[in-house]
Amino acid sequence: MSMIDDLPPLRDVIKRHALSARKSLGQNFLLDLNLTSRIARAAGPLQDATVVEIGPGPGGLTRALLAVGAKHVIAIERDERALGALEEISDRYPGRLTIINADATDFDPRPLLGTTRAKIVANLPYNIATALLIRWLSIEPWPPWYDVMVLMFQREVAERIVARENEDAYGRLGVLSNWRAETKILFDISPAAFVPQPQVTSSVVRLIPRYNPEPCDRRSLEQVAAAAFGHRRKMLRQSLKSLPADPASLAAAAGIDPTRRAETVSISGFAAMARELASIVGSGKRL
């Protein structure tokens, strides 16, 4: 028996359903139910919550979410081999688990949610984690259909997500993440907690959507950040040359010294440059 329910231990579940982790699916199974419970609790009170989980695998986090009281869990799993294990959890928690056999990168849960706001809680497959996060942060209109995300990433990716100006990991991902959400690394998880063991430490990150982010067009923000960090060691007057505006004039119009480098510019600074760029593109003129 596990420590959170009367279902079999995860190692037994994996063996019985022949769930050897597949590298092609970015799978690393987290077997420590104390850790899965900690992740579940990090999403806040779940008693009235609908939770969307990506890549549940044998269901360790799924079980934790249900055991701590989630009203409903929507589990999106691409690997058909895991469906039997998830069905066993569904039988233990009747009416509270919906299992979707789909690829999370092109599945939209909103039709299942209706007007219900959800929480996203997941040990994301490493090979799609960043792409999924960018997708969820790029939702329009904003604010999104979720009110919190608690997600696991490789430590290096987690540091990029939460990084701010003048930090080594600051880049395009940090600009988008911190523009649209309050971000925080909650805790790390050792490779030894997984089967198979990854070669890197993992980190659990919480992202809470900002209902009123700095006003600017998202695409313009991404365009400016991509240009600026594409040549991060160069001054803005050089790195922004790929944009449809004179780079020095664009930065100056946004109140930023064009001799600065991207890594020193705050989220507000990038938003200001994005507003200037959108204005230029909209007017059909070039500064």
Curated annotation (Swiss-Prot):
It is found in: Cytoplasm. Disulfide bonds: none annotated. One of its GO terms (cellular component) is cytosol. Its EC number is 2.1.1.182. One of its GO terms (molecular function) is RNA binding. Pfam families: RrnaAD (PF00398). InterPro entries: KsgA/Erm, rRNA_Ade_diMease-like_C, rRNA_Ade_Mease_Trfase_CS, rRNA_Ade_methylase_Trfase_N, rRNA_adenine_dimethylase, SAM-dependent_MTases_sf. It is an enzyme of class 2 (transferase). S-adenosyl-L-methionine binds at N28, L30, G55, E77, D103, N123. Keywords: Cytoplasm, Methyltransferase, RNA-binding, rRNA processing, S-adenosyl-L-methionine, Transferase. It catalyses: adenosine(1518)/adenosine(1519) in 16S rRNA + 4 S-adenosyl-L-methionine = N(6)-dimethyladenosine(1518)/N(6)-dimethyladenosine(1519) in 16S rRNA + 4 S-adenosyl-L-homocysteine + 4 H(+). SUPFAM superfamilies: S-adenosyl-L-methionine-dependent methyltransferases (SSF53335). Its main location: cytoplasm. The keyword S-adenosyl-L-methionine applies. Belongs to the class I-like SAM-binding methyltransferase superfamily. rRNA adenine N(6)-methyltransferase family. RsmA subfamily. Specifically dimethylates two adjacent adenosines (A1518 and A1519) in the loop of a conserved hairpin near the 3'-end of 16S rRNA in the 30S particle. May play a critical role in biogenesis of 30S subunits. This is Ribosomal RNA small subunit methyltransferase A. It comes from Nitrobacter winogradskyi (strain ATCC 25391 / DSM 10237 / CIP 104748 / NCIMB 11846 / Nb-255). The gene is rsmA.
